Amino acid sequence: MSKKLHISLIFSNLAAIKTLSSNHRMYNLYTKFVKILEICKQFSENLVNESGNVPRRGPVPKFSDLEVVALSLTAETESIDSEKWLFDYKLQEYKDCIPNLISRRQFNDRRKKTAGLCEELRKRVAMEMDGGEEQFFVDSKPIEVCRVARGKRCKMGRTGDFSQAPDFGFCASQNTYYFGYKLHALCGLSGVIHSY
């Protein structure tokens, strides 16, 4: 009897811990958003105006360009690939905390427009982390388009410029053949990616 009671207490404690950890993880999305927004504001000097937008004609949006970049980076840190899931489920809990939140369609359009701003912020953060390093190393990773068996039938990227078409290759570190592209990244000695 006491053994069954002890086991049931362990399971109830595990269930309570699991509930607390999932609530804590959900809370972290807004916390990460605020922290990433502060970092973006710190490194956006001379890139945006006082309201956090890239200077352009037209009405000033209430949800700033820096907030779009910060929300995009926050979703990346949480490994959220689906914008639908992010807006329909994850951000519903934080509507009170983020009052001027835009729709998913507007977010997608503005994220594409702010890609240059995001890239410039990434370069500034990388420069701050690495300093003025003079030595770099190149690392590469295969980006597989399709399986090797389907490579000859794959039409993706074959029209037009053949110098940019996917090709067969071998990855020595993974000891595998692949059909696709090879992504090269220029990294500093501390491991920060400078360009790709």
Regions found by a protein language model. Give the residues of each.
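Short alpha-helical elements
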Residues: 2-196
